[in-house]
Amino acid sequence: MNKIYEDNSFTIGNTPLVRLNNIGNGNILAKIESRNPSFSVKCRIGANMIWDAEKKGRLNKNIEIIEATSGNTGIALAYVAAARNYSLTLIMPDSMSIERRKLLKSLGAHLILTNGKHGMKGAISKANEIVSLNTKRYLLLKQFENPANPEIHQKTTGPEIWKDTKGNIDILISGVGTGGTITGITKYIKIKEGKKDLISVAVEPLESPVITQFLSGKKIKPGLHKIQGIGAGFIPKNLDLSLIDRIITVSSEEAIFNAKKIMKKEGILSGISSGAAIAAALKIQKENDFKNKNIVVILPSSGERYLSTELFSRSFKNENNY
């Protein structure tokens, strides 16, 4: 690659799309987002939210960035903040992996932990509380509603997938954390490229199916789960439900099992939310209408970020169930 980048924030994107040969029927294509500079899909939004704040004059060296995160967005913001010389404070539920805490600190971020039982809502509440004490000192990026989040996927991830598949994509599968990934990619393919028949599938935890509850008119009852990075427990503003065609729920155990499976059978190091996306792909591929369709699955992060979790600490007795 004959190019010198201005700083590491500009190295996002152009991640590989890899055919799975040992899982599914050969029509599942995995978008490996761990090939981004801080090894997750969140690198894209971490860079773009900071670039956007700079362009709009909301960020300078006297302002400290603050954000609530489940880990990967925080790591992405931390690497960009380090590369562009900004101070950063992150608020994260203490239920997230030890690896995430260590990475954040190593990248120079100040880390505040909140009670894990309150989930992302608790972290967001704490971030808002801190900013309210000094609105001139802090910039809260608000990843769940910041339009720079889906924008970067509409500008980069969507076009990359379209180019690599030559437009031959029938189904997109993505877990929902902030909703930015699936919204941005789907908007690009359905609206910009005009492929209205794309089936966009959102994945959420079975234990916390708030999107499913919302769409069925039921009371939203978030629950605890182990799929770090998706299932925030509320409907994020960046999730455009008008673009989504299907919701598939995946249990924490299914997600962990399939993350192990893709590592062992395909040689792709994958995190738990990647396992959830693969589980959803295998479910939809079993349906007669979709068994021969081209499926693109977003794999958000790599396995090393989960060494202290159940992804690496136990095996399953009921593997045949999946």
Swiss-Prot record:
GO terms for molecular function: cysteine synthase activity. One of its GO terms (biological process) is cysteine biosynthetic process from serine. The keyword Transferase applies. Its cofactor is pyridoxal 5'-phosphate. Hydrogen sulfide binds at N8, R35, L269. It catalyses: O-acetyl-L-serine + hydrogen sulfide = L-cysteine + acetate. Homodimer. This is Cysteine synthase. It comes from Buchnera aphidicola subsp. Schizaphis graminum (strain Sg). The gene is cysK.
